[in-house]
Structure formats: C-alpha cells, structure tokens
Curated annotation (Swiss-Prot):
<dbReference type="GO" id="GO:0000027">
    <property type="term" value="P:ribosomal large subunit assembly"/>
</dbReference>
<dbReference type="InterPro" id="IPR005813">
    <property type="entry name" value="Ribosomal_bL20"/>
</dbReference>
<dbReference type="InterPro" id="IPR049946">
    <property type="entry name" value="RIBOSOMAL_L20_CS"/>
</dbReference>
<dbReference type="InterPro" id="IPR035566">
    <property type="entry name" value="Ribosomal_protein_bL20_C"/>
</dbReference>
<comment type="similarity">
    <text>Belongs to the bacterial ribosomal protein bL20 family.</text>
</comment>
<dbReference type="GO" id="GO:1990904">
    <property type="term" value="C:ribonucleoprotein complex"/>
</dbReference>
<dbReference type="GO" id="GO:0005840">
    <property type="term" value="C:ribosome"/>
</dbReference>
<keyword id="KW-0699">rRNA-binding</keyword>
<comment type="function">
    <text>Binds directly to 23S ribosomal RNA and is necessary for the in vitro assembly process of the 50S ribosomal subunit. It is not involved in the protein synthesizing functions of that subunit.</text>
</comment>
<keyword id="KW-0687">Ribonucleoprotein</keyword>
<keyword id="KW-0689">Ribosomal protein</keyword>
<keyword id="KW-0694">RNA-binding</keyword>
<dbReference type="GO" id="GO:0003735">
    <property type="term" value="F:structural constituent of ribosome"/>
</dbReference>
<protein>
    <recommendedName>
        <fullName>Large ribosomal subunit protein bL20</fullName>
    </recommendedName>
</protein>
<dbReference type="Pfam" id="PF00453">
    <property type="entry name" value="Ribosomal_L20"/>
</dbReference>
<dbReference type="GO" id="GO:0019843">
    <property type="term" value="F:rRNA binding"/>
</dbReference>
<dbReference type="GO" id="GO:0006412">
    <property type="term" value="P:translation"/>
</dbReference>
Amino acid sequence: MARVKRGVTAHAKHKKVYKAAEGFRGRRKNTIRAAKAAVDKAQQYAYVGRKLKKRNFRALWIQRINAAVRPFGLTYSRFINGLAKSGVVIDRKVLSDLAIHEPAAFQAIAEKAKAALAA
C-alpha cells in the first residue's frame, strides 16, 4: 500500500485557521492549538451575537417610538393598541424611522392611533 503524506492538506487546514485568527493577540494567532480554540470560540460569540442583534434593535425601536409618542399624551403600549384598532399596519422599524426623520408623518399616525383609542 502506498504511503500517504498529509503535509499539504494539514498545511491548508492550518492556513485556513490562521487566516480566521488574524488580528488575535499572543499565541492565539500563531499556535495552531490555541488559534483553533480561539477561532471556535469567536464563531460561537458571533452566532450568539447575530441572535442578540435582532433583540437589541427591536428594543431600540420600541424605546424610540415610546419617546416619540410621549409628547402626544400616549405611552408605547397604548399607541400600539391604537394602531391595531385603527387598522394601521406599520412595523416598529419603520415607525422608529418615521419618528426620527419624518416627525409630521409620525404625528399624523399618532393622532390616528389616539382617535382610535378614544372611539
């Protein structure tokens, strides 16, 4: 049976790990065992971070909407309830963006929600 030398494949695998560990400090960037562990952990953090990002942005949008509806005498929850009753279907991301960049349009939406709550 022929002898299999794995130097080429091992080098390619290591090169891939070192590329991913670029920018790491200390042994984590140039020792394969430490680099592999560091890259694995970095990928775990990245995975969790992608999930947290969605929660954080939704929370930010809600805070912005809440701050924007307070001058109209509403709270966030009453505002959302008013939107549902009036049949307005706009997501929180767009509402937040409107509150910042188009205050007049947001005010019209807030007044519509307030009217739906009163009725």
